[in-house]
Structures are given as C-alpha cells and as structure tokens.
Amino acid sequence: MYFAGVDIGAVATKACIIDAEGKLLAYAVRKTAADMAKTGKETFKRCFMEAGLKAQDIRYIVATGYGGNIALSAFANEKFTEITCHSKGAKWLFPKCHTVIDIGGQDSKVIGLDDAGKVSRFVMNDTCAAGTGRFLEVMAKILGVKLEKMGEISLESKNKVQITSTCTVFAESEVISLMASGKKPVDIIAGLHDAVARRVGGLVKQVGAKDDVVITGGVAKNIGVVKALEKEIGHKIHVPAEPQIIGAFGAAIIAKEKVLAKAPL
C-alpha cells in the first residue's frame, strides 16, 4: 500500500511516495510553472515512476502548499495546510521536535508543537521577502554567485559585514554600495545570512524555541543560514537529509494515517 504527498509551492513543487511503514520510496522536485496543476501532475508522475509504481498503485494523495487547492481539484484526494504538513513531517523524522522553522522561497514560518506533535502556536512572514529564499536569490544575482554555493562560501568569511536593511529593496542597494566600497563578496554573504537569521529569529522569539528545533524548506540547505540562525536563537538546529521535501513528506504521512486508521493492516 502506497501513499503520496504533493507540495505545490510558489517557487518549487515537491512530491513524495511512502509505503505503509512511512518509508520514503521516492521524491521529486521541480520548479513551479504558471500552470500549477500541470506542474503538480508532472512532479507526481516523476515521483511514482522513480518508485517503480503506477498512478493506480497510490492509495491516497494529500496536497499542500500555495497551490494545494489546485492540486485538490486536479488529482489529489485531500488538502491540508502547510503548517500541519511541515509539522507532521518534522515530527515523524525527529520525534522530540517541538519547534519547526520553515524557510521557503516566498515566506517563512515558525511552528511550536506540544509533546504529542500538535500545533500549539505558529507565526509567519508572508508579506515581505526578507527572511526568505527570494531574498537570498536576489542577493546572489547581484553578487554574481550561485545560490546553492552561498552557504559554503559564507563559512570562509573572516570579516563579516553587517547588513542594516531588513527590506529586500533597501538591502539590494546596500549590497551594491558595499561592493562598490571594496567589501569582499564572502563577507557580504555572511552578513546577508545574519540578516536572514535576525528576521527569522524574530519569529522564533514570538513562538518560543524549545528543543528539538528542526528546520525545513529549501533555505535549510544553506549551512551559512543554519549556523547564523543557531547563533541567533541559541539552540542547535536539526536539518533533515532533504529539508525541501518535508511538507510533501508530511502530507504523505497524513495520507497514510488517514487510510490506515480506517483499514489497519
């Protein structure tokens, strides 16, 4: 018996296939296109083919994310919020998880969980690009570096530059000025990571960090941001092997639990 989760985000679409034990069999990630229904279907197809399965082998599909409702109308059986799915995925992988930090392409959120894994409180930033993947993407283009290389590059910084602007537009101008003044890109990048950490750290303070702290979302792949955030909040942060797919994975776990609750193996 197999289950699927599909997370259609504003930037990337993710899909996961798991078995009845919750084991991840396959996953797929692709850039979200204008036709979200098509992107979701194609990502789901790539995923079940990777697992050596057919669409009819998937017992239940749960959708989530920015395009969750679109997936629901196109091919999914049910839709759950990102808050619920990221919490479920993080708790499944890290049973002692009490705080989830999700930094995606267009928003960031912090979720507090009780001992049972239920959401006790959450806050999110979805009105400003600062503290999101989009912020780092813009800065990477200005600096002429690859987005995926920013993390490891920042670790080489010896003289970190402080970025005072929290607004993406103003920070963009600030970075250009810093480059013109001769500051090294590596030091600017380290400063940018601190700026993201301060922004997200403000959300963490509203919820209250409690161990274990788990980070999800594509930005979690950036070791520079993770280290800066650990310093900002004063807690060790656990990073899943594939942090970008945790929402989809959590959705798949929910699909499994819903079906097996009705018809246990």
Feature roles, as predicted:
Residues G5-K38, E42, R46, V119-F122, ...:
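Short glycine-rich, Thr/Ser-proximal phosphate-binding strand/loop in the N-terminal lobe
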Residues V204-E232, P243-G247:
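Glycine-rich phosphate-binding loops at beta-strand->alpha-helix junctions
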